Swiss-Prot record:
Function: The heterodimer glycoprotein H-glycoprotein L is required for the fusion of viral and plasma membranes leading to virus entry into the host cell. Acts as a functional inhibitor of gH and maintains gH in an inhibited form. Upon binding to host integrins, gL dissociates from gH leading to activation of the viral fusion glycoproteins gB and gH. In human cytomegalovirus, forms two distincts complexes to mediate viral entry, a trimer and a pentamer at the surface of the virion envelope. The gH-gL-gO trimer is required for infection in fibroblasts by interacting with host PDGFRA.
Protein name: Envelope glycoprotein L
A GO cellular component entry from the record: virion membrane
PROSITE patterns named in the record: GL_BHV (PS52025)
Source organism of the structure: Guinea pig cytomegalovirus (strain 22122) (GPCMV)
Compartment annotation: Virion membrane; Host cell membrane; Host Golgi apparatus, Host trans-Golgi network
Signal peptide extent: 1-31
GO biological process, one term: entry receptor-mediated virion attachment to host cell
Gene name in the database record: gL
Length: 258
């Protein structure tokens, strides 16, 4: 299922078929790093030289991902706003505004980037207000324009898929329990060479279960059971009782790591 891991102060777990990238903060001993140097290095070089994968760089870390440019993840599905939308404040031309404009201007993945910005936790009020423009029409039509070539889309009829890795997922963030999980997605514009990581909240316990089982399976397979990331995941999972989960699911790994 997985082919290699990359270790540094920032722990990166790479899965190549299918390719998944998970990130979390941790530190590991040099002896653990030595185990994966040969096979992992060969796989990484092969992947980096392949045209099969897209790649992006965030904070000097290169992430590889498989992307279907004609399909979008449910994670960034357009949600038509409800209620009375009003925006009575001035839009300030500040750094945040310029960053968003730079991401969108002449971006070949303009629609995907816009949908991600719409759903991001850090979207400013004026961006959230833009989601309601379609209320002026009877259907949510949008136009994207790149190099003066424009295309029309109906945001409610886009081909959405359940796989979150249709997007450029570079990590997950587990906040304070009982359940506060975010997916980190990198969006880029190659023309001004800008990349920004956006955070989208996920309430999916299924996604957490997959993350939990994947990480524990990997560390068990290399005999590293008592590492910080494993301990934190186990404690986090234990906090998901009560209203978040009536009973443990059947396919959970045995949590006894002794």
């Amino acid at each position: 299922m997985y082919e290699c891991m990359f270790f540094s102060h920032r722990l990166t777990i790479g899965f190549y078929i299918p390719l998944i990238v998970l990130t979390t903060m941790s530190s590991l001993s040099e002896s653990l790093g030595e185990r994966q140097k040969t096979a992992c290095t060969v796989a990484a070089i092969s992947c980096a030289n392949s045209d099969t994968y897209n790649r992006t760089t965030v904070s000097n870390h290169t992430f590889f991902y498989i992307s279907d440019r004609w399909k979008y993840s449910e994670l960034i599905r357009y949600e038509k706003p409800t209620g009375d939308l009003r925006h009575d404040k001035l839009i300030h031309v500040d750094r945040e505004f310029l960053d968003i404009v730079s991401l969108l201007h002449n971006n070949e993945n303009q629609l995907r980037t816009l949908l991600t910005i719409f759903r991001s936790d850090s979207a400013p009020p004026w961006v959230k207000f833009m989601r309601g423009y379609s209320q002026c029409l009877d259907h949510p039509i949008i136009y994207t324009c790149v190099e003066e070539k424009c295309q029309q889309y109906n945001l409610e009829e886009l081909p959405y898929g359940k796989d979150i890795f249709l997007e450029n997922v570079v990590g997950f963030d587990l906040g304070a329990p009982p359940h506060n999980m975010s997916v980190l997605i990198a969006v880029s514009n190659t023309k001004p060479k800008i990349t920004k990581v956006l955070r989208i909240t996920s309430t999916s316990l299924t996604l957490f279960d997959a993350l939990y089982n994947t990480v524990l399976t990997f560390f068990r397979s290399i005999g590293a059971r008592n590492v910080d990331v494993v301990r934190r995941l186990i404690l986090y999972q234990a906090s998901l009782s009560g209203p978040h989960r009536d009973a443990p699911i059947h396919n959970y790994l045995n949590r006894d790591l002794s």
